[in-house]
């Protein structure tokens, strides 16, 4: 049986991750720690002998810069890259920019957990005139404004990620191409839920650490047969726990 592989990487720590703020579609850059994390991810992939034919990422620079740093380490700077807003982080609506712990202190940790991890729970929406609304961002000027969210749940994030997976990424993997996706915690969670057929309750407990390569192995029909993180297991466990704790007061 021929095993096909996919690498998923959440971007390295961003400036707003460092400040424990809801980031969503805000286009913040990597922190210095995040740049180091991205290079470490590249080193892990290089050590394990990975190289790629195609790369996919979002249009947000914390993801695109993570990918660039990884490809620098792999000496694959000329790899074909496709950027899509459909791989963007989930849009956190009016929560975008707020500190997660302060928001938990105000609204309660359980409410914030529902906003962060509930499958269908929508955070409060932005007003269309809010400067944070994607329709007011030149980055999305060529897109239909009706496609651009004012808030998103994980369910609506799945709705935009899955067609991109089915129509763009999946055919390349079936064709035998080696693919890496560098995206965001929730766009990766959306993909993991779909690929692994997880329930709404199961995905609520899944947390994706920054810049740790997640390897998926598939059979020839692209059914998942295994997945695992690259790196030190204890360190990865600590990083996952840190992500889970972000929404606590």
Curated annotation (Swiss-Prot):
Site feature (Transition state stabilizer) residues: 184
Enzyme class, first EC level, given as a word: isomerase
Protein name as annotated: 2,3-bisphosphoglycerate-dependent phosphoglycerate mutase
Gene: gpmA
Single GO MF annotation: phosphoglycerate mutase activity
Assembly and interaction partners: Homodimer.
Listed PROSITE patterns: PG_MUTASE (PS00175)
Organism: Hamiltonella defensa subsp. Acyrthosiphon pisum (strain 5AT)
Binding site residues for substrate: 10-17, 23-24, 62, 89-92, 100, 116-117, 185-186
Protein EC: 5.4.2.11
Keyword set, alphabetical order: Gluconeogenesis, Glycolysis, Isomerase
Catalytic activity, as annotated: (2R)-2-phosphoglycerate = (2R)-3-phosphoglycerate
Family designation: Belongs to the phosphoglycerate mutase family. BPG-dependent PGAM subfamily.
């Amino acid at each position: 049986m021929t095993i096909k592989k996919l690498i998923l990487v959440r971007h390295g720590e961003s400036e707003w991750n460092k400040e424990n703020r809801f980031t969503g579609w805000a286009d913040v850059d990597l922190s210095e720690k995040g740049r180091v994390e991205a290079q470490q991810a590249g080193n892990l992939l290089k050590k394990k002998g990975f190289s790629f034919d195609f790369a996919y990422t979002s249009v947000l620079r914390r993801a695109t810069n993570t990918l660039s740093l990884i490809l620098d380490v792999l000496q694959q700077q000329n790899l074909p890259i496709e950027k899509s807003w459909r791989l963007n982080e989930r849009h956190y609506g009016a929560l975008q920019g707020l500190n997660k712990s302060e928001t938990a202190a105000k609204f309660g940790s359980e409410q914030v957990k529902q906003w962060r991890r509930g499958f269908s729970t929508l955070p409060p929406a932005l007003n269309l005139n809010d400067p944070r609304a994607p329709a007011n961002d030149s980055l999305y000027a060529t897109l239909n404004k009706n496609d651009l969210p004012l808030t998103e749940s994980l369910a609506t994030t799945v709705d935009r990620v899955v067609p991109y997976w089915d129509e763009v990424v999946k055919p390349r993997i079936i064709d035998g191409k080696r693919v890496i996706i560098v995206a965001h915690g929730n766009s990766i969670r959306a993909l993991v839920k779909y690929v692994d057929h997880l329930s709404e309750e199961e995905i609520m407990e899944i947390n994706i650490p920054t810049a740790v390569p997640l390897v998926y192995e598939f059979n020839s029909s692209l059914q998942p047969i295994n997945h695992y993180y690259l790196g030190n297991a204890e360190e990865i466990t600590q990083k996952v726990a840190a992500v889970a704790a972000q929404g606590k007061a």
